[in-house]
């Protein structure tokens, strides 16, 4: 009778260890998936960007270098942009269809912009927006 109790106790402990190791492995995998966005981040649908080669297939966010995506892809710092409605980027930005402009070599195939002529808080804007911003930020300098 005593050996059966020890056997059941041993099996219970082994089962508890098995469950806890499964939980620990799952948490470790989730942590690794969260930190994967630093380099070569992104995903298939609504994939977020990343530091280098970030982006995704659909609605992919941009990234620092080579960011962007296939559809509605956000821009990026260098070589940013995307295929359809792709946002621009700092250098070589733009996209194929309705591609947004960029700082250098910006533009796209259809409806794409070009280099910005007017900047408003670090982004391209129209001449009217730039003039309105200039009027609101102009200050009278005191004469000494």
UniProtKB/Swiss-Prot annotation:
| Pfam families found in the cross-reference section | GRP
Alphabetized, the UniProt keywords read: Membrane, Repeat, Transmembrane, Transmembrane helix
Q: Where is this region: 11 X 6 AA tandem repeats of G-Y-[NH]-N-G -G?
A: 37-113
Look up and give the membrane topology term: Single-pass membrane protein
Membrane-traversing stretches: 5-25
Q: Where are the sequence repeats?
A: 37-42, 43-48, 50-55, 56-61, 63-68, 69-74, 76-81, 82-87, 89-94, 102-107, 108-113
Q: Where in the cell is it found?
A: Membrane
* Any one GO cellular component localisation term in the record: membrane
Q: Which family does it belong to?
A: Belongs to the GRP family.
Q: What is this protein called?
A: Glycine-rich protein DC9.1
